[in-house]
Amino acid sequence: MVAKFPDAVWFLALGRLMDAEGELFRRLGYAEVRFVVRVVGDDGRAERETAVELDGYRVGRAVALENAPGFDPDFTICATAPVWNRMLDEIARDGRPEARHTLSSLALIGQELWLESSDQLREDKYYRYNQTLQELLNLSGKLPR
């Protein structure tokens, strides 16, 4: 069975690739962050949510949010399935998304992808670790589809 975005096993597969690409992530720096990836439906409601924890240079945990009572994310990254799929399709094709479709660019505009957080200082971790998050997603180009 092939792991699919945003399943926890998909993020755990990225974590194994992250381990293999250790030097890249060591150059980016230590990342300690807890976040949720949310796929939003056309009605604005969460369709799927996965809790992910980066612990240093590795994915320490990934689990469906419904199976993680008490998970306290620093932020939640929200986008519709077409937005996520466009980014992942570009990564599969080119190894990275087009510049205007990166996590950073999309969050800056805030229309197609946005952040939610109850604490501005914790939300700031998104910007602090943005390149690590993008490189983690870029590893998805190495996963079977």
What positions do the PLM features span?
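Feature captures hydrophobic
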Residues: 1-145
